[in-house]
Amino acid sequence: MTDHEPFQREPQNPQDPQVVVFSPELLKLADRRRQALEDCRQAAEDGDANAVVQMGMNCLYGIGGAAKDPEKAFRWFSQTAPDDPAGLYWLGVCYDNGFGVERDEDRACRLYQESAAGDYAPALCNLGVCYESGQGVEKNLEKAVELYRRAAEGGYPMGRCNLGVMYFFGQGVEKDLKKAAYCFAQAAEQRLPRAQYLLGVCCEFGDGVERDVSRALALYREAADAGYPDAQCALGVLHHQGKGVDQDDREA
């Protein structure tokens, strides 16, 4: 439902029958990571709000030398202070997606509201999604647009992208393809795959920008390389049709 997208790479299969030779440099790097994780854990246990959130993220995604453990991540996020917007947001993400706790969309929405009160851009964006879909609150597209705009003004790429979608379809705001394309372009510059794809659509069909199939192809390729399925499909269609590129069914 939310804009939350995991960004970690899945670790290799530990049962993979291969011989791994660690160089002294890699061993030193591993030691530094372990020490950094221990320092972060100690700071979190001492009450450092940023460290608490970082430990939660480490455990949620299996990054920073921590093992992936959603339940432990939830416990860390639960220790955040009631006035910490980042911690409240991540706790909301856990409830929203069922990470380490039973899914509770209403609770997630309330946490996003508390976090958004501190103008935390990711929470503003997710709260906008709640109002757009009617999750935990009465559906209100105008309110969703307002929240997406505030998130966009805070420089949050998904806020910019979602605002662009509202302009593109005229939901909660007057339809304006030029403003939609502008929002997509802002988010695409921040390398958001969804925005790269949507800007590519605008370029392919001339929606809000001058039609430019070559640019659309480049945008689709960037988003596809990042694993965005719709972009991979669009890229395949262009190769199949030979639009902006030599026709190539094998590449499609």
Question: Where are each of the predicted segments found?
Answer:
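Short helix-capping/linker turns of helical repeat alpha-solenoids
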Residues: 45-49, 61-63, 82-85, 97-99, ...
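Hydrophobic face of amphipathic alpha-helices that form TPR/SEL1-like repeat modules
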Residues: 54-61, 66, 88-97, 101, ...
